């Protein structure tokens, strides 16, 4: 009985302690009744994206930007293209016609296509093209820069940014 009470008290203390470590990011979703055109900021140092309406941050989330050697370029951009079901033309896998993967994690500029295979581009849902091959899209967000230069967002967040964007939406990427 004493052990179970101690375990319960220890568990509660851990929960209270860890709740103080919670991130200051708001929950996924829009806050308030902010109006005005949307614009986005991407903070490469903090690995964070913010969606603004006017001057108010209405949504923010963690992101994963370009890893070493594939840096996401800082600068001022505008959404050039929206593609709900985009696939990469550079990164993906070489597969047999039945879609069985033969060579994963392919860069078509560096990896020669084996005979009898087809290239299947990596899926990039909710794609917003910013510059050339750089864009924002849903993808794995491990908590550090890990992409080939794009800005990866959690799936639910990518949808929020996609829905808020129009071609021409300003995007500031800062260090």
Where are these regions (language model features)?
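Hydrophobic alpha-helical targeting segments used for export or membrane insertion
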Residues: 12, 86-94
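Exported/periplasmic cell-wall-interacting domains
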Residues: 21-33, 74, 92-175
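Bacterial N-terminal signal peptides that target proteins for export
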Residues: 1-10
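Short, charged/polar surface micro-motifs in flexible loops or helix N-caps
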Residues: 84-86, 133
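A generic, residue-level signal for flexible/boundary positions that often mark functional hotspots
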Residues: 12, 57, 145-147
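Bacterial N-terminal signal peptides
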Residues: 9-19
């Amino acid at each position: 009985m004493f052990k179970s009470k101690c375990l319960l008290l220890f568990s509660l203390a851990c929960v209270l302690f860890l709740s103080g470590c919670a991130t200051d990011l708001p929950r996924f979703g829009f806050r308030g009744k902010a109006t005005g055109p949307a614009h986005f900021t991407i903070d490469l140092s903090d690995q964070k994206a913010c969606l603004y309406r006017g001057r108010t941050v209405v949504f923010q989330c963690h992101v994963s930007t370009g890893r070493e050697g594939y840096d996401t370029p800082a600068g001022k951009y505008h959404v050039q293209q929206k593609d709900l079901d985009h696939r990469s033309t550079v990164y993906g896998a070489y597969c047999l016609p039945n879609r069985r993967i033969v060579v994963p994690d392919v860069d078509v500029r560096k990896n020669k296509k084996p005979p009898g295979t087809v290239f299947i581009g990596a899926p990039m849902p909710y794609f917003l093209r910013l510059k050339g091959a750089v864009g924002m899209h849903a993808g794995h967000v491990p908590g550090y820069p890990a992409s080939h230069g794009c800005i990866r967002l959690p799936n639910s967040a990518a949808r929020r940014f996609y829905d808020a964007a129009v071609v021409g939406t300003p995007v500031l990427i800062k260090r």
